[in-house]
């Protein structure tokens, strides 16, 4: 049997979750003082997973196999998906992200045809080749750093 007190507590919890949900999201990785909040815009569906790769300040590690410090996924949420990861410390980083619409854990793309939506930190203009590290790097500071990434749909 529910009492007025338990209903009040449940209602207050729902209000707090709605008000503070994004700030209270779970962060990926080893807990620490520094963290990155990704706000992924232009998410057109709730289909699949949003998968992000965090790259270190070394340009030679960018977009190479095993070059990422961490790869993690969360369920996609339209129109914006928020993600969080703990960082090893302040410094330069880069992020590559894609919406894994079929949840097969890889970015599906064809030379001529469908691409799963993708994006990079600092939203560089993408034409026919991958972006340079310098065009996507950002500086994370102690505490919380938030960046916005707009998904490209092709």
Language model segments and positions:
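A short, amphipathic beta-strand motif
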Residues: 34-42, 52, 149
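Beta-strand signatures of extracellular beta-sandwich domains
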Residues: 51-55, 96
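Exposed aromatic-hydrophobic patches
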Residues: 81-88
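A short tyrosine-centered beta-strand micro-motif
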Residues: 91-97
């Amino acid at each position: 049997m529910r009492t007025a007190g338990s209903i009040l507590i449940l209602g207050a919890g729902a209000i707090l979750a709605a008000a503070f949900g994004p700030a209270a999201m779970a962060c990926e990785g080893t807990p620490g003082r520094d963290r990155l909040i990704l706000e992924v815009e232009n998410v057109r569906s709730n289909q699949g997973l949003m998968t992000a790769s965090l790259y270190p300040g070394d340009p030679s590690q960018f977009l190479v196999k095993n070059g990422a410090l961490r790869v993690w996924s969360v369920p996609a949420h339209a129109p914006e998906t928020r993600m969080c990861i703990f960082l090893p410390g302040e410094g330069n980083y880069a992020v590559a992200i894609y919406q894994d619409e079929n949840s097969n854990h890889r970015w599906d793309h064809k030379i001529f045809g469908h691409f799963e939506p993708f994006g990079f930190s600092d939203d560089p203009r993408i034409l026919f080749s991958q972006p340079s590290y310098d065009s996507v790097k950002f500086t994370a500071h102690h505490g919380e750093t938030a960046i916005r990434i707009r998904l490209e749909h092709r």
